[in-house]
Structures are given as C-alpha cells and as structure tokens.
A protein has these predicted regions:
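Glycine-rich phosphate/ribose-binding loops and adjacent secondary-structure elements
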Residues: 1-74
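C-terminal extensions of enzymes
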Residues: 76-139
Length: 139
C-alpha cells in the first residue's frame, strides 16, 4: 500500500510497475495484492508445490520433497519436466478461473476494477496498516 501510494504521489505509477511477492499462495491472495495496487505478482512456493504435484513423494522418506525441483537437488534427475509443466499449467489455469469467478461475484469484469475499497478485515492493526475498512468498527 505504501509503495503504491508513494508511486502515485510522485506521479510515476504509470512509469514503474509494482510487483508484489511473498506469502501469495492462493488466488484469493493474488486478488488482494492486485486490490492493493500491484501491477503483477511473483509467486514462488505455490508454483513449486504445483509443479512438484505427485512427484514430491519420490525423495521421501530420506530427502525433503524439494530435492526433485531444485536445480541443485540431489534428485533433480527424477523430476519429470513434462508432468511438472502440465501441473504448473493447470495451476495457472485454475487460479485464473478462480479469480474470474471472484471478480464476477464482486460485479467486476477486470482486475483493473479492483481497489482497496473492495477489501475489509476484522484485524484492526491490519486495517490501519493497509488502510482498508475495519469490519468491527461501530458506526
């Protein structure tokens, strides 16, 4: 929120893309990031889990599941790239569809229509930090 407002205040929002990362695991998280002003999101862990779907069992019980997906992993040769690509594709497809459904439920047709006014929280501290509505506020 602060970065978005800073870019707008400096009148450079149209020249600099705001990319948000960290803690974005599911499409609901992605939508929140866009509502808070992100132009794009970077997902790390969730896509690694997606591409490793059903392959994460290969290194168990002696090695962690990540050993198949890391380029330097001890079991990188056991990773099926074709399956990983298919699982990643499905993750992106289902995430996009879930976001489309959520947008329709909010009466919106585009991510560009999202704003922080679409968000509400029951956490008073978060409401102040993110400058969004607080649900338990008495009127």
């Amino acid at each position: 929120v602060r970065a978005y407002k800073h870019l707008r205040k400096r009148k450079v929002k149209n020249k600099i893309s705001l990319i948000i990362s960290g803690g974005l695991n599911v499409p609901g998280d992605f939508l929140k990031a866009f509502a808070l002003g992100a132009d794009a999101i970077y997902i790390g862990t969730s896509i690694l889990y997606a591409i490793n779907h059903l392959q994460f069992l290969k290194p168990l019980p002696w090695e962690p599941p990540s050993e198949t997906v890391w380029a330097t992993g001890s079991m990188q040769d056991d990773f099926d790239v074709e399956k990983g690509a298919e699982y990643g594709y499905r993750f992106f497809l289902s995430s996009a569809e879930e976001m489309r459904i959520a947008l329709r439920a909010m009466g919106k047709t585009s991510l560009k229509e999202l704003s922080s006014s679409d968000l509400i929280t029951y956490d008073e501290t978060l409401a102040k930090m993110a400058q969004i509505d607080y649900s338990l506020q008495s009127k």
